Amino acid sequence: MDLKDVQPYIEGKICMVTGGGGSIGSEIVRSLSKLNAEKIVIVDIYENGAYSVKCEVGDKVTVEIASVRDYEKMDCIMNKYRPDIVFHAAAHKHVPFMELNPEEAVKNNVKGTETVADLAEKYNTDNFVLISTDKAVEPISVMGASKRCCEMLSLIHISE
């Protein structure tokens, strides 16, 4: 895909990237910067990755250290920035760890998605983009099942 095709949808927009310091989220942040987003808000619970991306991308990026599971904190962040687009990339993604910690997969992936999607709706965000995984197709792992639930939650929000 040519990024120039996407630029009209991003240029001049306020974009939020949950998990913006992670492997996928940081690539989204870099792309948004190249596409001339007006402001990019990284929401991440881990400051190291978020700090690195901010240093790389520059002043266009603002970092908020928060968990997507914390509804009140996320509500404050959404109210503060009023993003046009939310890219929800925050997730536990390592299958073996989630098999050992299924409740954490559900709390972080499912509850986090529910929180971010609810708030995107509350603040009239133009677009909510869920970053999922191939493991959500006919899931055989806790992580895959949790991400499938995230997809279904996102579809429910679209249909409302």
Which residue ranges define each predicted feature?
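Helix N-cap at the beta1-alpha1 junction of Rossmann-like dinucleotide-binding domains, i.e.
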Residues: 46-49
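A short, basic/flexible loop-to-alpha-helix module at the beginning of a structural domain
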Residues: 1-13
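Conserved SAM-binding motif I beta-strand of class I
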Residues: 42-43
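N-terminal Rossmann NAD(P)H-binding glycine-rich loop of SDR-like oxidoreductase domains
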Residues: 18-33
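Residue-level detector of conserved catalytic or cofactor/ligand-binding positions
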Residues: 156-160
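Conserved S-adenosyl-L-methionine
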Residues: 33-39
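Conserved Rossmann-fold NAD(P)-dependent oxidoreductase catalytic core, especially the SDR/UDP-sugar
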Residues: 82, 88-148
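Conserved Rossmann-fold cofactor-binding substructure of NAD(P)-dependent oxidoreductases
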Residues: 65-85
